[in-house]
Design a protein with these regions (language model features):
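Active-site cores that bind ATP or allylic diphosphates and position pyrophosphate for catalysis
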Residues: 110-239, 244-251, 260, 264, ...
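Residue-level signal for inorganic ion chemistry
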Residues: 32, 63, 103, 107, ...
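Short amphipathic alpha-helical segments and their helix-coil junctions
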Residues: 6-12, 256, 295-302, 336-340, ...
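Glycine- and acidic
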Residues: 11-17, 45-49, 204-209, 259, ...
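Catalytic adenosine-cofactor/nucleotide-binding cores of aminoacyl-tRNA synthetases and other
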Residues: 52, 229-232, 236-381, 435-467
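N-terminal Rossmann-like or analogous alpha/beta NTP/dinucleotide-binding catalytic cores
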Residues: 2-127, 218-232
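C-terminal accessory/binding modules appended to enzymatic or scaffolding proteins
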Residues: 385-434
Length: 467
């Protein structure tokens, strides 16, 4: 069987604009981009927007913005054009009609006039007889109700085995006789997924189809369409493992917030960290290395080391990877990336806080929690007498020091040494007095980021608020 030149790698993703951008879309896009860039190939974005009821233009925009944020830019697509456009399925309806007409004319497809009630009755009968359901081919026989005006178009499954190569799972084989004649054109004239997708893949010369494992069962039907039309098959497929929630269930848009790609941007995850994590979610590099630049991923990635089973999402691992990326940013870049998350602070204040924040942030949004005391006035804590005394002692040593982290640190450490209580017991009431929280940046920065008079005022207020 003819196949395209394997040296001309062309891959694609084909998301549907029916809701927010899903984490799985980003994962699939990443693996496609890595494969394309490693082979000097082309990455195509196609929009599968034939679901008339659920598609929204704004969701298509969300797909673009999310992929751009991750740096997963495409070479051809609806907004860029290309030699095999249009790249929206809703703009390719004539293409599908022509191909369906051809299959009908060649006897490889037929009109089905069965109503939904009649099809439901067939399914119930199959259930009662405890056999897998497949369409009865009633409309191929003399009893077909051809006087009806509403019909679908079904593909006439030829039978036999459908074989293909999966770069993750190896040689695959399906018995097409178990599939049954499937609908390729719905009663409203729109194509089904298993018809439009292979027609587009063939027309766009897609060499490798890389997608989630939920599409594995679709592959035999799609290859039968390709064969019936006489087109070249893709060189190979790769069906990636599903991303699972921590409890092992499938990641759901309704139940699992981590499935929403926009969440990561809003929470302050760095796009390069998200890509790094997604690459490791189902792929093992075979070494102890866990932090990869994009170029390193391009060179290291291979489908041979992708696991077959689902990959469980792990917030702790993502937070660790994101923290590693944050720590590698220089002061200027970290300041710039923090600014959208700290709109109440000026650039100079953020820059002063950066050295204290760098090692404490699992995500950029966490900076707002740590620095909230800078734009709020937390109530004075109710301290035990001994703790209030420690705050009073701090006021005494801080009154005369230059208001810089190093000087504050030296004076407070002298207080620690004098009291013999240790840093934690000495600093906790000071921290509570200034921020209202038990967690903040290092105490020297916590104080220095406030104007001196404000910091001392809060300390005095707390020292007088004894339980």
């Amino acid at each position: 069987m003819a196949v395209p030149d394997a040296s001309k790698v062309r891959v694609r993703i084909a998301p549907s604009p029916t809701g927010f951008a899903h984490l799985g879309t980003a994962s699939t896009a990443l693996y496609n981009v890595l494969f394309a860039r490693a082979g000097g190939g082309t990455f195509v974005l196609r929009i599968d927007d034939t679901d008339v009821e659920r598609n929204r233009p704004e969701y298509e925009v969300v797909i673009y913005e999310s992929l751009h944020w991750l740096g997963l830019d495409w070479d051809e697509g609806p907004d860029k054009g290309g030699p095999d456009g249009p790249y929206r399925q809703s703009e390719r309806l004539d293409v599908y009609k022509q191909h369906a007409a051809r299959l009908l004319a060649e006897g490889k497809a037929y009109r089905c006039y069965c109503t939904q009630e009649e099809l439901d009755a067939e399914r119930k009968q199959a259930q009662a007889e405890k056999r897998p359901y497949k369409y009865s081919r009633r409309c191929l026989g003399p009893d077909a109700p051809k006087d009806r005006s509403v019909f679908t178009v079904r593909f006439k499954v030829p039978g036999g085995e459908v074989k293909f190569e999966d770069m993750i799972r190896g040689a695959m084989s399906f018995d097409s006789g178990l599939i049954g004649d499937f609908i390729i054109v719905k009663s409203d004239g729109y194509p089904t997924y298993n018809f439009a997708s292979p027609v587009d893949d063939a027309a766009m010369k897609i060499s490798h189809v890389i997608r989630g494992e939920e599409h594995l069962s679709n592959t035999p039907s799609q290859l039968m369409i390709v064969d019936a039309l006489g087109y070249d098959r893709p060189v190979a497929f790769a069906h990636m493992p599903l991303i699972l929630a921590k409890d092992g269930t499938k990641l759901s848009k309704r139940k699992h917030p981590e499935s929403n790609l926009i969440l990561y941007r809003e929470e302050g995850y760095l796009p390069e960290a998200v890509l790094n994590y997604l690459a490791l979610l189902g792929w093992n590099p075979g070494t102890s290395q866990e932090i990869f630049t994009f170029d390193e991923l391009v060179h290291a990635f291979s489908f041979e080391r992708v696991q077959h089973g689902g990959a469980r999402f792990d917030w702790e691992k993502l937070n660790w990877i994101n923290g590693e990326y944050i720590r590698r940013l220089d002061d200027d870049e970290l300041t710039q990336r923090l600014e959208p998350f700290l709109p109440r602070l000026d650039e100079a204040t953020i820059r002063r806080a950066v050295p204290a924040l760098r090692t404490r942030l699992p995500k950029l949004q966490a900076a707002a929690d740590l620095l909230e005391y800078l734009w709020t006035d937390p109530p004075a804590p109710s301290l035990e007498p001994e703790a209030a005394d420690r705050v009073g002692a701090a006021i005494a040593v801080l009154n005369s020091v230059p208001w810089e982290p190093e000087a504050i640190h030296e004076s407070l450490m002298a207080l620690v040494e004098k009291s013999g209580l240790g840093p934690n017991k000495t600093f906790m009431p000071i921290r509570l007095a200034v921020t209202g929280k038990k967690i903040s940046p290092p105490i020297d920065y916590t104080l220095a980021l406030l104007p001196k008079d404000v910091a001392l005022s809060r300390l005095r207020r707390a020292a007088g608020a004894e339980a």
